[in-house]
Amino acid sequence: MTSRRQPGHARPLSALTEYDMAAFNTERVLSVHHWNDTLFSFTTTRDAALRFHNGHFVMIGLEVEGKPLLRAYSIASANYEENLEFLSIKVQNGPLTSRLQHLKEGDTILVSRKPVGTLVVDDLKPGKHLFLFGTGTGLAPFMSIIKDPDVYERFDKVILVHGVRWVSELAYANYIENELPNNEFFGDVVRDKLVYYPTVTREPFRNQGRITELLENGKLCADIGIPQINPETDRAMICGSPHMLADISAMLDSRGFVVSPGVGQPGDYVVERAFVDK
């Protein structure tokens, strides 16, 4: 997988034909939104028995020639929402994504019945600020997390940092900036605590540069108006390309942060271990 292909949202697994079809629900596509020529999202029905933690992922796919063609996708919808939502890149020759990008309303898709993952708030130690570092479609799990009222009770500030190449790749920007703060149930706390910091690398924008650069030179925290990131007060969640995961993890480690070693073991930051290339 190259750095342009975001983990958690189109990741190949081996021995796909061994999957038991009984482990999947068949869901119906309700809507499809194409953000640009490389990025799209879609919503589906949700089986009433499906339960997950915000930040979890599922296997989704299509039945091709009688066999399931599957990839791991983070769930972009919150665990209390009626439908499921997913964010995906378009890969012209990708075994699954080349087919998924042509989904239309009414089509069916396979969704695994057992969501899993290590990118969950429960595995973070208490802190003051929660940083959500995502690149590309690594935004997906954080969309579910910023819609979780419990997250805002745990932290004074929730800082969503989304790094992309082009402005058109800033999926959900309007929702984050204008719709979520007006949520009828918890919009007031979103307005008070959520900080959205999109940054672009390949064209002019109000914030420019890679996330790692903005952390290392201090610009990100200075722009937000908080002290530089430190393990005494700050917690982090990371989702993106393997290169980005490695870089930010190394930077946090060098500053004294300790990663959660596994499910049920709190740390200063968490990553989705299933998507970290060995």
Listing of model-derived features with the role each one plays in the protein:
Residues 135-141:
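Ser/Thr-glycine-rich phosphate-binding loops at phosphate-binding pockets of nucleotides
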Residues 124-129, 231-232:
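Short helix-loop-beta connector
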Residues 141-153:
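Histidine-anchored nucleotide/phosphate-binding helix
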Residues 4-8, 19-23, 161, 168-278:
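Reductase modules of NAD(P)H-dependent flavoproteins
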Residues 58, 109-112:
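Generic structural signal for buried aliphatic residues
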Residues 130-133, 237:
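Conserved beta-strand elements of the Class I
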Residues 115-125:
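A short, basic/flexible loop-to-alpha-helix module at the beginning of a structural domain
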Residues 5, 12-105:
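Ferredoxin-reductase
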